[in-house]
Amino acid sequence: MSSVSVNHRHEILLLPRHKRNTQTVIAGESAAIDEAVAKFAEMGKRAVKLAVSAAFHTKLMAGAAEKFKGEIAGFPFKAPNCDFYSNLYGRKLDDFSDMPSYLAAHICSPVKFVDELSAMQSAGIEAYVELGPGKVLTGLVKKFDRGANAMHIENAETLEKALAALKG
């Protein structure tokens, strides 16, 4: 465990995400992040500043979350036809009655990725598929469980590979 003190001139430095048992993402004002990264380096700890456009998953995004919620308020959401696991709550999601609030909360709330994976593993989930560009989450799943059947889909080629792997 590490403890880092940063200068109090920065208003916000939060620990919003637990990606895996050995990795925590800090978020907040850019200057506070820079100072924390420097402090970790002084301690001989690895710290990498992520290239992100905003302080997602922190209260700094509350205004954007409210605006987003208003924009999607009239969208006709439907409950999925399969189990849906939430990294907002770290468990299976059963209540789909207020999806605008749920989705807006993702913008300014911590991500409980390890809790979500633990819940999925406990439920007997055996395959994990990441949709979209890149393989960040696929890699994190494999670090969480080295034997996990984790794959990503970002185009027609990777879709074919994933379907073949899922069919066995």
Question: Predicted regions: what is each one?
Answer:
Residues 105-168:
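Flexible, low-complexity segments
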Residues 1-110, 163-166:
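Alpha/beta catalytic cores of group-transfer enzymes, especially the acyltransferase/condensing modules
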